[in-house]
């Protein structure tokens, strides 16, 4: 099973990945987790460049994310799925669709196609979008902003709206949940939703 978690920075994705990992492991399942960008040596180098490096064009940013993602799929995700492990991702290609495609104005469909090529068409069984208001995201990030988080409020509003658009486009796999819920309640809703997946 491949599950991705999406949402604005500070929405609680990492917390929910860890809670789901613990729950699945308690059931005796092998679980692999990864963050994006990252998860491989090359991916971590790209992460440092895109989040903490200098300015770059929107297409350069999108292509770097896609390169990191291609490496993660080949080195980590596909081997884990092949041996029957569950894979939980703290971001996946939907992040690029909303951040670069919609937030940066490169085009939702263009960035989606780029990323589907990069991942060889590997789509999650379920994607959870943890929705929080853009101003709440910026509050939670606080004093640790990276290059993306330093964007203006209008950018973050476009990204938040982009996640809603994504859910409408792919209702069979994208589930939007209230990221302001208590983490325990949110974890229960996620586990309940995954029981329908298998």
Spans of features found by a protein language model:
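Pre-Walker A (Motif I) flank of P-loop NTPase domains
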Residues: 1-2
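Hydrophobic anchor at the beta1->P-loop junction of P-loop NTPases
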Residues: 5
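P-loop (Walker A) phosphate-binding loop of NTP-binding proteins
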Residues: 8
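Conserved lysine of the Walker
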Residues: 13
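Hydrophobic positions on the alpha1 helix immediately C-terminal to the Walker A/P-loop
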Residues: 16
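NTP-dependent small-molecule kinase module
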Residues: 21, 135-198
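A glycine- and Lys/Arg-enriched "phosphate-lid" helix/loop adjacent to the NTP-binding pocket
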Residues: 91, 96-161
């Amino acid at each position: 099973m491949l599950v991705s978690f999406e949402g604005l920075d500070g929405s609680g994705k990492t917390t929910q990945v860890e809670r789901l990992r613990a729950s699945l492991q308690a059931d005796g399942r092998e679980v692999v987790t990864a963050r994006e960008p990252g998860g491989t040596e090359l991916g971590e180098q790209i992460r440092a460049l895109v989040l903490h490096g200098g300015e770059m064009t929107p297409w350069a940013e999108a292509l770097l994310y896609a390169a990191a993602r291609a490496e993660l799929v080949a080195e980590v995700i596909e081997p884990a799925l092949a041996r029957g492990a569950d894979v939980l991702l703290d971001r996946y290609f939907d992040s690029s669709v909303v951040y670069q495609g919609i937030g940066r104005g490169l085009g939702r469909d263009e960035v989606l196609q780029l990323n589907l090529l990069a991942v060889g068409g590997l789509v999650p069984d379920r994607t959870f979008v943890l929705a929080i208001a853009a101003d709440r995201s910026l509050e939670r990030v606080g004093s640790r902003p990276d290059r993306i988080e330093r964007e203006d409020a209008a950018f973050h509003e476009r990204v938040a709206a982009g996640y809603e658009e994504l859910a409408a486009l792919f209702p069979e796999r994208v589930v939007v949940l209230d990221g302001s819920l208590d983490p325990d309640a949110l974890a229960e809703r996620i586990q309940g939703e995954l029981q329908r997946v298998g």
